[in-house]
Swiss-Prot record:
Keywords: Cytoplasm, DNA-binding. Disulfide bonds: none annotated. NCBIfam families: DNA_YbaB_EbfC. The lineage of its organism: Bacteria, Bacillati, Actinomycetota, Actinomycetes, Kitasatosporales. Gene3D superfamilies: Nucleoid-associated protein YbaB-like domain. It comes from Streptomyces griseus subsp. griseus (strain JCM 4626 / CBS 651.72 / NBRC 13350 / KCC S-0626 / ISP 5235). This is Nucleoid-associated protein SGR_3378.
Length: 114
């Protein structure tokens, strides 16, 4: 028979799980508030996304606008947004990675990108 019926260990596990859940929620809120940038064309096109990947701003230098070649501009926009999203994913790894390790890896946990 386990002294105390094993209750203290279960209570401790529940408290740890609640703390991890709170830490995860706080990290996700911080990611949603944090903005990261990406650029393309040597800075002619800049995109800003939140740490959770939401596009917030797009700045296009007038030098990048050629009415005869809108395809290149579109490519630069896509590249800038992709670069910003890659930076957001790196930030997610930085902020959420330690929490996922505390949960035994992020595998299968909704909201974790790894």
């Amino acid at each position: 028979m386990i002294p105390g019926g094993g209750q203290p260990n279960m209570q401790q596990l529940l408290q740890q799980a609640q703390k991890m859940q709170q830490d995860l929620a706080a990290a996700q809120e911080e990611l949603a508030r944090t903005e990261v940038d990406g650029q393309a064309g040597g800075g002619l096109v800049k995109a800003t996304v939140t740490g959770s990947g939401e596009l917030r701003a797009l700045v296009i230098d007038p030098k990048a606008v050629d009415p005869e070649d809108t395809e290149t501009l579109a490519d630069l926009v896509v590249a800038a947004v992709q670069a910003a999203n890659e930076n957001a994913q790196a930030l997610q790894q930085e902020k959420l990675g330690p929490l996922a390790q505390g949960l035994g890896g992020g595998g299968g946990i909704p909201g974790l990108p790894f």
